[in-house]
Amino acid sequence: MNGVAVSIIFQRFFLKGQKGLTPDGTLNTILTTLGLDPILWFDVDRPFLANCCLVFISIWKYIGFDIIMYIGAIQSISPDLYEAADLDGANPWQNFRYIVFPSIKPIISLQLILAVKGAISVFEIPYITTKGMMGTTTFVIKTINTAFSLKKVGLASAMGIVLLIITIIVTFIQKYLSLIHISEPTRLQL
């Protein structure tokens, strides 16, 4: 789903109005109906709460893709492996530990790489939801502001290159660590 659409939907869920400063969004309406006080979700004094809301939005946005990847990986496991494990007397935990988990390790590695890359270069959700205010500024938002608000295009380009280098280094480290773990043999011990 488009990150802009998701951000606008959740902005209305947490806050109402264009400025985002009034705590009368859908969630606070529910809290008030339950007899609780409304909460200012995106507040300058509580950047932790604002960042938790952004994490929740990001998880909601990407969880469908992640689940589809894992379901596809699990369904690609040969039924013969499960049959052999049943004949050997494996319980469900052993099936998971020795058949499912080793079979989906490459997908877990890919998902971790995509998650870290996305976390490093996150832009649309915090920018649309909070405009990068209230302690939610990311490196990419800072880069965009440097380029367009401060008119320092050269500095913004250098910041983009630094982000690219950091992303490549982190990806190589993750790939190296995942190759070490994937190459380790696992034996079924009953």
Language-model segments: which ranges?
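Cationic, low-complexity basic patches in intrinsically disordered or flexible, solvent-exposed regions
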Residues: 190
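A structural signal for multi-pass alpha-helical bundles of membrane permease subunits
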Residues: 1-179, 183, 187
